[in-house]
Amino acid sequence: TAVNKQPWHFIVVTDKDQLQKLAEANPNAGMAAKAPLAIVVCGDMNKALEGDAREFWVQDCSAATENILLAATGMGLGSVWTGTYPSKERCDAVTKVLNLPKFLIPLNTIVIGYPDSQVTPKDKWKQENVSYNAYEGD
């Protein structure tokens, strides 16, 4: 992380009532109601950098989120990143469900469970999304 600040706090949710409330708090996290586990990744503003670098917490917590997703996949689990921040409505709803203090900002909810079936990964590579040495678009 930037200057090794590790500006995060993870809330692991296994309680069925809380999972249901998280599903209701975020329209993209409906599957949380049926999942055994969700992790809410929060930015801890008490640990964030100062000044212009303060917003690096988003990058740091996003990198941590991706690592959690990769670890879950490596364990044979299914997982999905459902965005919360920067939607004020979603942040407020998740904050209320989890009783978060003001210094914690919910970035996302990672829903984790056992997949119903094996899904073949889709090839999403698009050459037009890559430039070399400088922007090559229109």
Each language-model region and where it sits:
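Acidic, surface-exposed loops and disordered segments
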Residues: T1-D138
